[in-house]
């Protein structure tokens, strides 16, 4: 049996098997995150106890001490985005200047690296700010999964177009695989955001709602391969691509020093990417007589994003035009994330909430 779901002119084909597999993966990941945070939180419970004048441990309060607390929370989360359609504008020096209308995007949340993020929040009473780095995947509908892997029942989309392709009127509708061999952001539709938060009065001693809005930058890993073109014309690199913002609402559960949350996010980002015909820079590309390759290899992946962004900056500074052209689109998504982390009390309130016997 196959269930078809249509929303905003987007059709999804969901089988009971695929839905069950996705739920099992999400449950397993959430369980690992929650278990790890519970272990950290329980290990810190004794640190939260204060002593009275006789040296006896005092009991902690039921959790109401967080109402006006100054504290810092570091956490990680997992999620799966639902993308909306968007126009895709492509311009290349071969006479291509076209718009692909309302292209669809899919995620591949549980293919490594798993979709999610990491963040740090500093609260001062009921207001706070958050630095949030989020990694999701976004893949054009070419009948493939992340990194071009084979998937069952893959859908190749036909889209309406305007403009020119290779100097001639673009065909409309266009079968996407006639243009792209790969068009995706699978090492990340990455966004880095600074958000302002407000948390409301606790619903219970341990559960508290919050809202937030944030602005930042999109830093996707652009993978753009065109059908029939040589390997050295493929773009595979991180780029600063434009502004991004998010709106969020969630519920936080406290257990000792543990912070667990269920959160809704709406994320929008603008992507204006250069088609450079290059791959990500890493330490493996460094020619050195005094740094052996066995030393460089373990750190090579960590240098790809900063190396690519530095190359992008030098191209911008020199006025160098991308040799293969450029494209522009937007990505907007809804998602529910599940996460957990650890709470560090602020100095002024580290002993707050202790109850004398």
Report each predicted region and the residues it spans.
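Short glycine/proline- and aromatic-enriched beta-strand/turn motifs that initiate or cap beta-hairpins
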Residues: 43-124, 290-357
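Residues that define the transmembrane beta-barrel architecture of outer-membrane proteins
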Residues: 70, 112-116, 186-192, 207, ...
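Gram-negative (and chloroplast) outer-membrane scaffold detector with strong preference
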Residues: 121-226, 344-347
């Amino acid at each position: 049996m196959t269930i078809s779901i249509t929303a905003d002119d987007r059709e999804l084909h969901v089988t009971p098997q695929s839905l069950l597999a996705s739920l099992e993966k999400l449950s397993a990941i959430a369980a690992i995150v929650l278990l790890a945070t519970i272990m950290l939180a329980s290990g810190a419970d004794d640190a939260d106890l204060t002593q009275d004048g006789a040296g006896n441990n005092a009991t902690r309060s039921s959790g109401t001490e967080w109402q006006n607390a100054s504290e810092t929370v570091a956490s990680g989360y997992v999620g799966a985005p639902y993308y909306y359609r968007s126009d895709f504008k492509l311009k290349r020096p071969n006479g291509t200047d076209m718009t692909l209308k309302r292209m669809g995007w899919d995620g591949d949340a549980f293919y490594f690296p798993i979709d999610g993020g990491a963040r740090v929040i500093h609260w001062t009473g009921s207001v706070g700010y958050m630095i949030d780095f989020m990694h999701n995947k976004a893949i054009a509908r070419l009948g493939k999964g992340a990194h071009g892997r084979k998937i069952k029942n893959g859908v190749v989309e036909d889209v309406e177009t305007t403009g020119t392709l290779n100097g001639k009127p673009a065909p409309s509708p266009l079968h996407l695989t006639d243009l792209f061999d790969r068009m995706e952001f699978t090492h990340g539709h990455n966004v880095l955001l600074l958000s302002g938060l407000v948390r409301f009065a606790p619903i219970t001693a341990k559960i508290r709602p919050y809202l937030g809005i944030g602005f930042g930058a999109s830093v996707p890993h652009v993978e753009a391969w065109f059908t029939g073109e040589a390997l050295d014309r493929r773009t595979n690199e991180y780029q600063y691509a434009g502004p991004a913002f998010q709106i969020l609402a969630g519920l936080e559960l406290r257990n000792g020093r543990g912070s667990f949350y269920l959160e809704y996010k709406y994320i929008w980002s603008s992507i204006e990417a250069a088609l450079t015909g290059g791959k990500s820079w890493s330490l493996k590309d460094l020619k050195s007589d005094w740094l052996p390759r066995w030393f460089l290899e373990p750190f090579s992946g960590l240098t790809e994003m900063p190396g690519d962004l530095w190359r992008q900056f030098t191209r911008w500074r020199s006025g160098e035009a991308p040799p293969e052209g450029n494209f522009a689109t937007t990505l907007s998504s809804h998602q529910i994330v599940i996460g957990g982390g650890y709470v560090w009390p602020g100095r002024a309130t580290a002993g707050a909430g202790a109850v004398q016997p």
